[in-house]
Design a protein with these regions (language model features):
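C-terminal motif of bacterial Sec signal peptides marking the signal peptidase cleavage site
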Residues: 15-19
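Conserved functional micro-motifs across diverse proteins
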Residues: 20-167
Length: 167
């Protein structure tokens, strides 16, 4: 009799544990992920703080360049120039974007480095109510027709992603 009672207790415990675990799975499956918006050339992203628009950022173009630096240590497969612009709408601090804010990824999934190519437009500090633009050159490790650009808007984890064709 004790054996039957013990066996029944084990079976009931097993069923109750199975029921609990399937409920947890349902809760996990019901959670939805927020999909990150991917931006393209010419699309402006807005950085907000405390519900107020602070900065607008736009990638204007990504182009190939045949410019090579004979003194560069790296020999990339392809060199590109990213042309971008930004506007300080209402940030109390001056706004400045440069390669420090960017992570460039080629089609092979390689994180790429800046390259010492000639650029024509240098970014400037932008006080509230002003705009600036800039260019950054990157050496791609793999020949690519497009890149992914991750832009760090404020150094506190507010990032946006661009997928950009190379012209």
């Amino acid at each position: 009799m004790k054996k039957i009672l013990s066996l029944c207790m084990v079976i009931l415990t097993s069923f109750s544990l199975c029921a609990c675990s399937s409920e947890e799975r349902k809760e996990t499956n019901n959670q939805t992920k927020t999909e990150e918006k991917i931006y393209g050339v010419g699309e402006t992203t807005t950085y907000k703080k405390d519900g107020q628009e602070r900065v607008h950022f736009t990638v204007n173009s990504v182009s190939n360049t045949s410019d090579r630096n004979e003194f560069a240590d790296s020999q990339p497969e392809q060199v590109i120039i990213i042309h971008y612009s930004y506007e300080n709408i209402a940030s109390e601090e001056d706004v400045y974007f440069s390669s420090v804010n960017f992570k460039v990824i080629d089609e092979g999934g390689n994180v790429c480095e800046t390259y010492p190519a000639s650029i024509n437009t240098y970014p400037q500090m932008a006080p509230a109510g002003t705009k600036s633009e800039g260019e950054e050159a990157y050496g791609l490790k793999q020949q690519s027709s497009k890149i992914k650009l991750v832009v760090d808007l404020d150094y506190f984890g507010n990032k946006v992603t661009y997928e950009l064709p190379i012209q």
